[in-house]
Swiss-Prot record:
Protein name stated in the entry: Large ribosomal subunit protein uL5
Classification via SUPFAM superfamilies: RL5-like
Alphabetically ordered keywords of this record: Ribonucleoprotein, Ribosomal protein, RNA-binding, rRNA-binding, tRNA-binding
BP-aspect Gene Ontology terms: translation
Source species of the chain: Jannaschia sp. (strain CCS1)
Pfam families, per database record: Ribosomal_L5, Ribosomal_L5_C
NCBIfam families: PRK00010.1
Known function: This is one of the proteins that bind and probably mediate the attachment of the 5S RNA into the large ribosomal subunit, where it forms part of the central protuberance. In the 70S ribosome it contacts protein S13 of the 30S subunit (bridge B1b), connecting the 2 subunits; this bridge is implicated in subunit movement. Contacts the P site tRNA; the 5S rRNA and some of its associated proteins might help stabilize positioning of ribosome-bound tRNAs.
Length: 186
């Protein structure tokens, strides 16, 4: 039985034990508070045209995202009506969830060690940073996560994963994520 009172995620322990020291040496930080750390991970599934025809699709996306994240996901709604897409204001269009703390570290661990190796023809992720140390990536199918039962899903959703760090530069953020075993391709 897992003792949740004393549980520390594997990557969180690695950060405090080895990654902090490696980052301090690599970038010459004088203070531990200068070392970049993970702030949050935002997961988003846009159900798109599927939910315009059937509003239950957004609910399905929410349930799948809740299973993947281990935390309740929120249904996202359209901000304004767009007649060309048959979209109405406040119509459900997807789901999102923000992970912080231990759940964030657990998700990143599952992403890099379980989900990414299950992607067909996977050659690493493109290092797409925003200039301020935040990393964004997309996945074509959410079925690579072990929490999703392939037989029970009706649609294979694509999903966005945004990793927000306290890093000031992209080089610092890339180094931090590389220490967390993020498989970059270049």
């Amino acid at each position: 039985m897992l003792d949740t009172a004393n549980y520390t995620p594997r990557l969180k322990a690695a950060f405090s034990e080895t990654i902090k020291a490696a980052m301090k040496e690599e970038f010459g930080y004088k203070n531990d508070m200068q070392i970049p750390r993970l702030e949050k991970i935002v997961l988003n599934i846009g159900s798109g045209a599927e939910s315009v025809r059937d509003t239950k699709k957004a609910k399905s996306a929410q349930e799948d995202l809740t299973a993947i994240a281990g935390q309740h996901a929120v249904v996202t709604k359209a901000k304004k009506s767009i007649a060309g897409f048959r979209l109405r204001e406040e119509h459900p269009v997807g789901a999102k969830v923000t992970l912080r703390g231990d759940r964030m570290y657990d998700f990143l661990d599952r992403l890099t060690t379980i989900a990414m190796p299950r992607i067909r023809d996977f050659r690493g992720v493109k290092p797409s940073f925003d200039g301020r140390g935040n990393f964004a990536m997309g996945m074509k199918e959410h079925i690579v996560f072990p929490e999703i039962n392939f037989d029970k899903i009706d649609v294979a959703w694509g999903m966005d994963i945004i990793i927000v760090t306290t890093a000031n530069t992209d080089a610092e953020a890339k180094s931090l994520l590389a220490h967390f075993n993020m498989p970059f391709n270049a």
